[in-house]
Amino acid sequence: MCRRAEDLVLLLIPILFGYFSHASEHECKCVLFNVTSGNFHSPEFPAPLEGVPCLFYHFQAPPDHIIRLTFDVFQLPPRIGVCSSSIMLFDHSTDGLIEFGERADFEFCGKEISSGRQFFSKDQHFLLQISSGKESSRGFRGSFLAIPKKNFTSDAVEMAECSYRVEKQKAIIYSPDYPYYYPSKVNCTYHIPQRKGFQIVVNSIVMDIGRDAILQIFESVEGKFEKRLIEMVTSVQKSIYVSSTSSLLIYFSAGNNDVERAVGFVIELQYSNAVWSQSPETASECQLNINSENFKEGQLSSDKIGRFTSSSLPTKCQIVLQGYPNEKISVKFTHFNLYVPDNKNVTKRCTEVDNLSADVRVGSRLSRIDEWCGKRAPPNLMSSSNLLQLEYNTKSSKAIRESTNDDIGFRLDYKFHTDWNMGNMKAKVDKKKECRFSFNSSEHTNGKLWSANYPGLYPRNLYCEYIFHGRNDQVVHIHFEYFDIEGFNQCDETTQSDYILFSNYQTHDRTNRRFCGKTAPKGPILSESNYFRMIFSTNDIFDATGFYAHYQFITQEKSQISRVKLTISSSQTPFSSFFLVILLFTFRYIANIF
């Protein structure tokens, strides 16, 4: 498709950005992106796009990789019957070549590509064709990334063609060719064998099957031939959750997918062995399990828990709140006053007096948040997974507690939820991302934003994105009113710090520093353009109360100089940047000749 231009400069300088070829018959030029990540945009962006009759962008990944394109800006003249200007995507080429006149897999114009939309190639080549008439438009901008195909390999043993057996404690299975759309007429089976003392939990991460497809889950007992249908998924269903102590067989029949091009499914499978239930010896002391299958929200009081209602002895009680795999748990204390003898000092340690501790599940282990005693009430708590455990330890007897005139004990409200409880932030929530919020100036020119569970402790192992989209002539100001992010120094991995990072790109931006600690950034944070991204990342070690900020889209005067910034990889030396500039000017010179 793209041929190397016979030019001395191109022969001497390694190609960092791409190269042009002159097709004498069809007058198409081609730019090759042969690095693993970077940014792309319409010619001369942010200057208007016009008068580009035929230009190809060829994205080439290493072998056994695929290409992902992500758009953050897309605005061409609108479709009036047909597109006067458009981009066409060819996502299935095996060698980077297409035939003249070959029909594209996708054609877009107007505002038909929303911000954040992603496209995947089937193999290592992805071709994007630009065709622009005389009518000017804003153009487009995005990022590309080469991804190893092995990232989408099912955690299962392939017994025959598209027939798998799951043998791991926890596994993820993918539909054929995911994240590319699955082929038509394919039939696949996934066998999850029974394990004594375990239940199998099936939870969908992605569920997008076409109208002609069907996914069925059958239950059977090992050693027996009969099976029972327990779940049937069609195109209208976007999620599944199934648990069983028997063997499971997942059967997928694709039907025809040539037109609809559904991407299929990503399903998480896990053997759950009642880790959180107690042995008869310990369970007899005090154990309370609250499951979201029965109660999505409710209240709890310490004087209603287990042996606290009758025992006169010191004891401890575990309260386990467990939801579905896609749920989180929030806890808010409405009363907290634990008994403390007059001769005890609880300013430093709570272990010698009545206390309450909280743990959350991180991976396969429980991680302690903190412990509280006296009248120091816990902050609002939120888990990042589907399990949160409280443990109430009493050193005092019931008689001593009741002898006081104080209201001894605690009361709390709990809630199971699938979102981050941030609906009041007036942001658009990306359902395909775990924690992504978008702010568009067409809806609100200013507003507030905050960390999950603010003003309580933010969850652990969190990665949240706050995306800002303004008009062409707008930038974004962000000003922090409250800032408490656990960390210090450079806020990097060596200090095990949580952090906030700002970026003007969708890919990783090393030019912007991280922020953490208790000191907010000085003055407002200002974006370079109308697109801005704020990242909030937490680890699984420590906690803090997060941040509260306000944002505003501000209209600026248009620059007298049109500046173009081309970024292909995350790092370039001054030497390579110098030759890149020479190369770009050479391309323009060649283009003018032809």
UniProtKB/Swiss-Prot annotation:
Checking Pfam families in the record gives: CUB (PF00431)
Tissue expression profile of the protein: Widely expressed in the nervous system. Also expressed in neurons that do not express glr-1.
**Function of the protein:** Accessory protein required for glutamate-gated currents. May participate in the gating of non-NMDA (N-methyl-D-aspartate) ionotropic glutamate receptors such as glr-1.
At the top level of its lineage, which domain of life is listed? Eukaryota
Q: What is this protein called?
A: Suppressor of lurcher protein 1
Subcellular compartments: Postsynaptic cell membrane; Synapse
The entry describes its oligomerization and partners as:
Interacts with glr-1.
Entry-listed glycosylation sites: 34, 151, 187, 345, 355, 440
Q: Which CDD domains match?
A: CUB
Q: Source gene?
A: sol-1
Q: Tell me the residue ranges located in the Cytoplasmic compartment per UniProt.
A: 593-594
The species this protein belongs to is Caenorhabditis elegans
The membrane topology of this protein is: Single-pass type I membrane protein
